[in-house]
């Protein structure tokens, strides 16, 4: 679905030659960046590994068919993802050196991951730790789970149960990597009072956001 005359206008303005397939992200996207980010890539690659998707590709499929059944736990795990243990782990090489003494008094250097390195560092902290690495910098990645997330949810549909309880929204406030998920059933006509209070712009101890 697109605006009437879009292709004709794009061709008239020189954005499209009329010969190549009309790909919206190529014709209209003004930054020229790829039409996907590492978040899209990571989810699709995880669900369909045999496709051998890579970040070097020009574009990714809009969707993929999961190669295995996807459970509720799988979905929650993806929403908590920070790429820890993968090649995109931003903290894996943020090491610091500390001098320690052995039992015999011999001084030596020990290298360990900085206790300041974690998956939700501020930009300033990330740059500070990166500055200690010399020329070999770690690229900052946009993780799926982020501290500035307002909320996330997973919809589960269970057709073998009555509609009132078969449909459930697993709701999470704030960072999906740190907050629990609360079931909100399709048959509910009301929610707890704390879910009716907005706590995004101010501190409200009676808001579910600040509880979680």
Where are these regions (language model features)?
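C-terminus-biased signal that marks the final domain/tail of proteins
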Residues: 1-212
